[in-house]
A protein has these predicted regions:
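C-terminal regulatory
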Residues: 1-95, 124-128
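A late-sequence structural motif
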Residues: 88-128
Length: 128
């Protein structure tokens, strides 16, 4: 909906002509710096002004699906959503650290090793 009306940005500088949805301040975020696209390509501490703020990643997805504007969404939430288009695929998002915490005594158990390998295989494919 949104891209049909406003066009598909082809460069970072073209983002200035677009509307953005942001992750509201104060809301706990499952990823580091969810609003990184608001600063992308801008100098100093400048930031694009969002047209809407939401307090969840799922809220960002719903707003994008409704045609409100563009938002930075992690791949894990968009992978099975057919009508979401990745803009500027050549631009890499920020890295997010994740921790898998377990007692030292369980470090070498088959259960922990299998789960750690499973998590790594899934998480290593995600992009922001």
């Amino acid at each position: 909906k949104y891209l049909e009306q406003y066009g598909h940005p082809k460069t970072v500088s073209e983002l200035n002509k677009h509307k953005f949805i942001s992750y509201g301040r104060g809301a706990p975020s499952p990823v580091f710096n969810p609003d990184w696209a608001l600063k992308l390509g801008l100098k100093d501490s400048k930031k694009r002004k969002p047209v809407m703020k939401v307090n969840s990643v799922y809220g960002l997805l719903l707003a994008v699906q409704s045609g409100v504007g563009l938002a930075a969404l992690p791949d894990y939430i968009t992978v099975s959503v057919p009508n979401i288009v990745k803009v500027l695929p050549q631009v890499e998002g920020p890295k997010t650290e994740a921790y898998f915490v377990y007692p030292q005594s369980l470090k070498d158990t088959a259960r922990i090793i299998a789960f750690r390998n499973f998590l790594y295989s899934k998480v290593s494919k995600w992009e922001f």
